[in-house]
């Protein structure tokens, strides 16, 4: 955690660093209080169940099929609220091969979820597309399905031309721009 904070721009104090320190505090408190720490497989199961709660049976089954192709690391790396948001984004766009969702994360940072067919050089392609879309990447979580068919990637990014928070309209437009840039790449 300390190395993560030191590795980022010193002028960048934001919710991301706040969240890192909060997580460190909570885990330290659990250890000091000797509360049992859950196994990563239990955390993954809990987060998966939590992500499914708001959906009807058909959509739950669709998401269970999707989740079954991801390992525990995916669920341990993504917080429950992000998994719920990603799940809703997938359900809204389940007829698409390329799914892009954008949401405000902390202050002027954006969380970008991209689910796409896996291919050679995909990470490079996605980073170039985000750069071409006017974004600076702060963090990335890259996941490939167990069967190597699709990738479910999450980026934390900042718009390179301003520091303001994005409106819902801005986020939808950004999603469309990323999709367009992906297709044209």
Task: Describe each region flagged by the PLM.
Residues 1-185:
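Regulatory modules associated with amino-acid/nitrogen control
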């Amino acid at each position: 955690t300390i190395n993560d904070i030191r590795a980022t721009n010193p002028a960048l104090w934001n919710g991301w660093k706040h969240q890192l320190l909060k997580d460190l505090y909570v885990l330290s408190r659990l250890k000091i209080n000797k509360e049992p720490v859950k196994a990563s497989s239990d955390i993954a199961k809990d987060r998966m169940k939590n992500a499914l709660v708001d959906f009807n049976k058909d959509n739950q089954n669709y998401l269970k099929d999707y989740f079954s192709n991801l390992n525990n690391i995916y669920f341990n790396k993504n917080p429950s609220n992000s998994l719920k948001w990603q799940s809703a984004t997938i359900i809204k766009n389940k007829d698409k091969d390329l799914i892009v969702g954008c949401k405000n994360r902390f202050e002027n940072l954006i969380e970008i979820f991209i689910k796409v067919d896996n291919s050679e050089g995909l990470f490079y392609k996605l980073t170039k597309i985000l750069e071409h879309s006017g974004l600076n990447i702060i963090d990335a979580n890259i996941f490939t399905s167990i069967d190597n068919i699709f990738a479910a990637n999450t980026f934390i990014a900042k718009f390179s031309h301003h520091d303001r928070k994005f409106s819902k309209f801005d986020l939808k437009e950004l999603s469309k721009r990323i999709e367009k840039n992906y297709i044209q790449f």
